């Protein structure tokens, strides 16, 4: 039974790794700030999954320690990039949040140094042989691991907090995209915490089940980031789209960022406007010499 579980787990985690890479590429191809940040985040998520496969297959103590470090290092960088993404995604302008990005990068470097040292001198984790159904060793926490744990879950709390706070500040129709991302990160953190504090107690706690959730999280986060708003706007504009089918149509969201445009609008303004997903109403009006009040009133221009 243990062998069957191990085989199934390995197959599942390999599929999850492929999904992470595919979604990372798709996000990066969006060719904007959010896309690049998500692409890097998902790329590190794939590295986490790959290193965990190596952990499962490794039989030697030193090899297990090396691959465990290779697992913990990208985990921290993934959360650092996720926090940077969350600041951009929630359009947070608070200075403290942006300083937090720099602090997170410094902590990521310190975390990397700790786990580069750990295989030769155990300062963060040591390992106990168990000959389990899936892995051969489980970890025991040493003092320096506290830094890793506290700062990682600090980043988790920051990401969830930014998303929930943003959800309280936007119209009701837009709240699910922020709540969805925040809840997804929170669930993964809880599952990972089970693994951290109860390794080996039960079969599912012997392995980090949260790794399997990363691929689901990448899909959910990608969809909420790039597709949710357009889906909501399309539903709300289904009737007016038919009424104005012969007109160039451009729609901006409540923050003044472009959400929808049709091909006729692109043709009308292709010489004066460079359309991108980050185009704002103010930038559009400056490029076209259209009065911004016309857009705010909802009247055709």
Residue ranges, per PLM feature:
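Terminal output helix/cap of sensory domains in signal transduction proteins
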Residues: 276-301
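Interfacial "cap-and-anchor" motif at the non-cytosolic start of specific transmembrane alpha-helices
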Residues: 6, 167, 171-240
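Juxtamembrane membrane-water interface segments that cap and precede transmembrane helices
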Residues: 1, 128-144
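PAS/PAS-like sensory domain cap-loop motif
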Residues: 265-276
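Individual alpha-helical transmembrane segments in multi-pass integral membrane proteins
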Residues: 2-18, 32-118, 145-153, 204-215
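Membrane-helix interface motif
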Residues: 116-130
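Sensory modules in modular signal-transduction proteins
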Residues: 228-260, 265
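Alpha-helical transmembrane segments of multi-pass integral membrane proteins
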Residues: 25-51, 69, 100-106, 141-197
């Amino acid at each position: 039974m243990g062998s069957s579980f191990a085989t199934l787990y390995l197959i599942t985690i390999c599929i999850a790794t492929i999904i992470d890479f595919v979604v990372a590429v798709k996000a990066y191809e969006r060719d904007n700030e959010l896309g690049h940040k998500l692409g890097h985040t998902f790329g590190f998520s794939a590295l986490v999954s790959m290193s965990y496969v190596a952990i499962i297959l490794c039989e030697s103590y030193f090899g297990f320690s090396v691959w465990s470090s290779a697992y913990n290092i990208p985990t921290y960088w993934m959360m650092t990039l996720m926090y940077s993404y969350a600041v951009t995604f929630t359009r947070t302008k608070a200075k403290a949040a942006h300083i937090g990005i720099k602090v997170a990068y410094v902590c990521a470097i310190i975390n990397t140094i700790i786990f580069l040292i750990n295989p030769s001198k155990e300062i963060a984790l040591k390992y106990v042989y168990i000959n389990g159904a899936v892995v051969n060793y489980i970890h025991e926490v040493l003092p320096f691991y506290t830094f890793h744990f506290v700062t990682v879950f600090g980043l988790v709390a920051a990401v969830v907090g930014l998303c929930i706070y943003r959800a309280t500040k936007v119209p009701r129709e837009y709240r699910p995209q922020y709540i969805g991302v925040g809840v997804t990160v929170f669930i993964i953190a809880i599952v990972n915490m089970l693994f951290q504090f109860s390794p080996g107690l039960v079969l599912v706690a012997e392995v980090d089940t949260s790794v399997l959730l990363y691929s689901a999280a990448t899909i959910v986060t990608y969809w909420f980031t790039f597709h949710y708003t357009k889906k909501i706007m399309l539903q709300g504009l289904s009737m007016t789209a038919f009424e104005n089918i012969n007109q160039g149509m451009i729609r901006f969201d409540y923050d003044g960022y472009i959400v929808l445009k049709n091909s006729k609008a692109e043709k009308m303004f292709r010489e004066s406007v460079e359309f991108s997903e980050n185009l704002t109403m103010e930038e559009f009006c400056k490029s076209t010499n259209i009065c911004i009040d016309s857009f705010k009133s909802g009247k055709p221009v």
